[in-house]
């Protein structure tokens, strides 16, 4: 009798699992800029542990080209405010369409799994970004970042190549001038801490 019940349970479970469920098709090419509370250069980006606990940061992802199941994502910007491994807030530019907003939300567990896991909110909001050869500024409703490029030999920007994560390719080293966050539950104010810009290419296999 137990054998029959076990076999029945297996059959029911197999019937409940869709066979050959279609996986979404997506890809993204983006410019990334971030400042966090770690020292320069942030050990997290090399696969290490934060130099400042908890690691507090703001990252802007500016999608240059990409799509999710046919929805064009070119021009979409989002800011992730985070306390690493604890929580995140994700703000998508209020210029996106409803269709793009839904596509970004669907893509969160695929492209932004770490941030998605502890996500406290996912909302549209005004986002600004200014980029020059030596300076990057960006802001959202609760956070702002102003950082300057770090120069090395012969006055050229410091570059780090072939970091472990795809997120950190063509990495240019920056240092924060001002990095702030203020909300009802969390706040910070950092300067002289790590910052960077990078290129990120990712997508479904």
Residue ranges and their predicted role:
Residues 6-16:
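Bacterial N-terminal signal peptides
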Residues 16-17, 191:
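Compositionally biased, low-complexity repeat tracts
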Residues 23-205:
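Beta-strand-enriched cores of mature, soluble protein domains
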Residues 1-4:
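Positively charged n-region of N-terminal signal peptides that target proteins for export
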């Amino acid at each position: 009798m137990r054998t029959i019940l076990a076999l029945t349970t297996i059959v029911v479970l197999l019937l409940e699992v869709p066979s050959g469920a279609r996986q979404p098709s997506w890809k993204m090419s983006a410019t990334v800029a971030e400042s966090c509370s770690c020292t320069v250069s942030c050990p997290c980006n090399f696969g290490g542990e934060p130099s400042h606990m908890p690691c507090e940061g703001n990252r802007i992802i500016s999608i240059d080209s990409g799509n999710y199941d046919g929805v064009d994502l070119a021009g979409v910007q989002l800011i992730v405010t985070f306390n690493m491994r604890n929580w995140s807030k994700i703000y998508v530019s209020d210029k996106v369409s409803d269709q793009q907003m839904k596509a970004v939300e669907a893509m969160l567990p695929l492209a932004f799994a770490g941030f998605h896991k502890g996500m406290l909110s996912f909302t549209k909001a005004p986002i600004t970004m200014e980029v020059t050869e030596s300076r990057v500024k960006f802001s959202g409703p609760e956070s702002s970042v102003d950082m300057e490029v770090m120069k090395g030999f012969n006055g050229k920007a410091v570059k780090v190549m072939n970091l472990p994560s795809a997120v950190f390719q063509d990495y240019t080293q920056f240092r924060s001038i001002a990095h702030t966050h203020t909300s009802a539950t969390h706040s910070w104010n950092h300067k002289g801490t790590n910052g960077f810009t990078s290129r990120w290419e990712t997508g479904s296999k």
